[in-house]
């Protein structure tokens, strides 16, 4: 738990390969003896130049090269579309702005997020983001790099076909692979089996994985996550007398990261004298505001979503229900012993300890063990970086030639 009166920084922030049993796990690099080189494959430039890993999230698109420990680029998933009615005749400025381009314009913009609760709803914006990643951020020629793209749990199967069409037809990449975000997350832990509990900005999932196989029939989803926590914090602050609006969400996001925490025993926190909870926060205009119980009350919505108007169960209940659906005793024990937290929303101070307590109360006979890796905010990307670096994985790239021969369904042959 965060120290209640510790000084806080002031200001605002800137902003399934192969068949079952054949998937190369994260420890394959320790076992790999070069057997994959005996495969009859045409040599491609893709093996000589590092692959690109792209994890498109609701808040940021994380990207970088395979083999790196963490993503190099964090690109906002918000795209700015210029308003046609505001443009003068002969205006040659860009109509779509991404990343740092959004900071350097005075033109009226319509802000669009291409994802809703983790699912792509605007493919044009996805194309705009990827174009920015290749040409502006990474400054690379996409036709020279294989690309691994993450796909959220329970997403429409057509998503993978659309990813393939965009990458091969629009960007001309030589090879690609699409795989489950949850599978990549578990690889970041160095495991191939476990219960992945991931909560990012727009959606949360509880996903059982057995020896590299994602089990969608046992997977649970909740349409709340870090973005909803931010909105709830703004509601609490306004109830305390402030006047924040959606235009201030970046400030609220920073307050959440720097001042808020999950209380291990919220009843005890409520009994503290105000002075033990209060911290001052300096707004960009220099004004100081005091934040009290809102610091821990906001995180309660992850355990009681009804506080923020949701009818879905809290994350511990969602996880306990998933364990309850595991009928095989040995499998259930394995899942309970490997509950893995992933995603930025789980980075809140005190959350792992509180989650462990709540889950243990709900599943006393299962002895659940919760793990929280320090870099779990980027667990999906890191898992992709590990996977794409393995020699045993190289046979699982879908080539441009395969796409041209079979169309977008070629993606299902290896993904």
Swiss-Prot record:
User: Is the keyword Phosphoprotein assigned to this protein?
Assistant: yes
Gene Ontology molecular function terms on file: structural constituent of cytoskeleton
Q: Which GO terms describe its cellular component?
A: actin cytoskeleton; cytoplasm; nucleus
Q: Name one Pfam family in it.
A: Actin
Localization, per the record, is: Cytoplasm, Cytoskeleton
Residue numbers spanned by region Disordered = 1-31
Origin: domain of life: Eukaryota
Q: Is Phosphoprotein found in the keyword set?
A: yes
InterPro entries xref list: Actin, ATPase_NBD
Q: Which residues carry this modification: Phosphoserine?
A: 6
| Alphabetical keyword list | Cytoplasm, Cytoskeleton, Phosphoprotein
- Expressing tissues: Detected only in the testis and, to a lesser extent, in the prostate.
Q: Which family does it belong to?
A: Belongs to the actin family.
Q: What is this protein called?
A: Actin-like protein 7B
At the highest ranks, the source species' classification is:
Eukaryota, Metazoa, Chordata, Craniata, Vertebrata
């Amino acid at each position: 738990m965060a120290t209640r009166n510790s000084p806080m920084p002031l200001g605002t922030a800137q902003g399934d390969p192969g068949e079952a049993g054949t998937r190369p796990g994260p420890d394959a690099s320790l076992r790999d003896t070069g057997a994959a080189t005996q495969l009859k494959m045409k040599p491609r430039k893709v093996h000589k130049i590092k692959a690109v890993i792209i994890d498109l999230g609701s808040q940021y698109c994380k990207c970088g090269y395979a083999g790196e420990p963490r993503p190099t680029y964090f690109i906002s998933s918000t795209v700015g579309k210029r308003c046609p009615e505001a443009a003068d005749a002969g205006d040659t400025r860009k109509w779509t702005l991404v990343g740092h381009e959004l900071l350097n314009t005075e033109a009226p913009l319509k802000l669009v997020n291409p994802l809703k609760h983790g699912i792509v709803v605007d493919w044009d914006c996805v194309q705009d983001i990827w174009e920015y990643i290749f040409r502006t951020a990474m400054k690379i020629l996409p036709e020279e790099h294989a690309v691994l793209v993450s796909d959220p749990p329970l997403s429409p199967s057509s998503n993978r076909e659309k990813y393939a069409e965009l990458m091969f037809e629009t960007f001309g990449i030589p090879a690609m692979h699409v795989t489950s975000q949850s599978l990549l997350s578990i690889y970041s832990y160095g495991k191939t089996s476990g219960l992945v509990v991931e909560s990012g900005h727009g959606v949360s999932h509880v996903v059982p994985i057995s020896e590299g196989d994602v089990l969608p029939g046992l997977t649970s989803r909740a349409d709340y996550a870090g973005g909803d926590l931010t909105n709830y914090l703004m509601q609490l602050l306004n109830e305390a007398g402030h006047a924040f609006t959606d235009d201030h969400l970046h400030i609220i996001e920073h307050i959440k990261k720097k001042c808020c925490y999950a209380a291990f025993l919220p009843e005890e926190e409520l009994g503290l004298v105000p002075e033990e909870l209060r911290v001052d926060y300096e707004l960009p205009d220099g004004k100081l505001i005091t934040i009290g119980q809102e610091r821990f009350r906001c995180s309660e919505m992850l355990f009681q979503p009804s506080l923020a108007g949701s009818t879905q169960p809290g994350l511990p209940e969602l996880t306990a229900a998933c364990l309850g659906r595991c009928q095989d005793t040995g499998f259930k024990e394995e899942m309970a012993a490997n509950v893995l937290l992933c995603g930025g929303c789980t980075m809140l101070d005190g959350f792992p300890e509180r989650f462990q307590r709540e889950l243990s109360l709900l599943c006393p006979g299962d002895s659940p063990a919760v793990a929280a890796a320090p870099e779990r905010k980027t667990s999906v990307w890191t898992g992709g970086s590990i996977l794409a670096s393995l020699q045993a994985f190289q046979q699982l790239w879908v080539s441009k030639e395969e796409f041209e021969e079979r169309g977008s369904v070629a993606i299902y042959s290896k993904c």
